């Protein structure tokens, strides 16, 4: 596959709104009208339980991993980075949702880094798990994990292009969590629960 073809594939795969599709298929509802309105795994877990939510999380991760991995191993490292960035852009503004608001990029960005810079991905995953375990805030875990991306990029001495991707990804994830940050400041952010119930805003 060509450089341009893989970047296009990245955007198309990133545009697959798995949370929206799976909830439509298995529950007959619009996830955008439930809980926080997000199409990502966190909102799906809160509203419909772990099985459906974790499935969404895995698929959202894979749609970032696949184009990034293919680009790195079959074209060039830069292709993998740009294909991964395209997947994140697709997740944010999905073609299949007519470019309306998508997800917050956390799982998809994780998949991208597993495809292009696995040690960064592993480090960020550890940060997410530890932070979530201590706080039970998915938003705080995601923000801390995002902040750690460029740190791990420097620690493991990755290329300039990977470092740039880490900064861009961190900024994007933090920016997309700005409403969560506001709720954290006012003490109205909700801690995560795996109980099957309708989601409170996050």
Predicted regions and their residues:
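Cytosolic, membrane-interface loops and tails of multi-pass inner-membrane proteins
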Residues: 20-53, 101-102, 182-202
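C-terminal ends of transmembrane helices
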Residues: 19-24, 88-100, 128-135, 178-182
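Loop-to-transmembrane alpha-helix initiation sites
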Residues: 122, 138-146, 157-169
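Interfacial segments of multi-pass membrane proteins
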Residues: 45-48, 67, 71-76, 90, ...
